[in-house]
Amino acid sequence: MNPELVLVVGDMFVPQRAPDIDPQFKAILIPNKLQHVLSLGNIGSRESYDWLRSLSNDFHGVKGDYDTGDMPEKKLVTIGEFQIGMIHGHQVLPLGDVESLSGIARELDCDIFISGNTHQIGVQVLDNKLFINPGSISGAFSNFVADPSPSFILMVLTGTEAIIYLYVLNDRTQKFEVSKVEYRKGEENYKIVNDNENENEENQEIQHEMQEVPQEEQNQQAEE
């Protein structure tokens, strides 16, 4: 069974609150290396939207509280064996509260529920469902955090198994760090596989998942 590589992003706000996506992130996120892109809204501009659409032929999005257009407020997407629910997150109170989000997750009858709005990356399990927040890929400011770290999530879905890679740009070193979480559909918890001390190994592993993007190509794109 072939793995499905899924990008999860939220709250870009480019150019309103951030000038662009960090070049190191763009060097990894190359068109036609991803099978699916899931956007949680507040993209910011047509150019940013077009960039996201260029990354994969299978794009799904929901509307954020600053978005216009006809995207849905919530959505259910099937990828492999997983039902994935999507919502921006401004619709529930308290904002970002998993207990509040769980009602919508039950309504959608999903295995994985992704939401944004808080600009803070996170993973949690409740009622045998995996809740994911990718944070803000541009590090755009919010009412929750004045200066959040840019972040996004890559999911590798194979059968009933999900590997979650959390990418966060370290503000001090200006290098991205990678954490890895493993989850099996319907389980009560997830497994933290590594911490940021092993980020180099994780970078190599996810690059392999993305069809072995050459390191020289990534470096060249990061310099442009």
Where in this protein do the model-derived segments appear?
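N-terminal active-site segment of His-dependent metallophosphoesterases
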Residues: 1-58, 67-73, 151, 184-191, ...
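Helix-adjacent hinge/juxtasegments
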Residues: 58-110
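Short active-site segment of divalent metal-dependent hydrolases/proteases
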Residues: 14, 45, 91, 120, ...
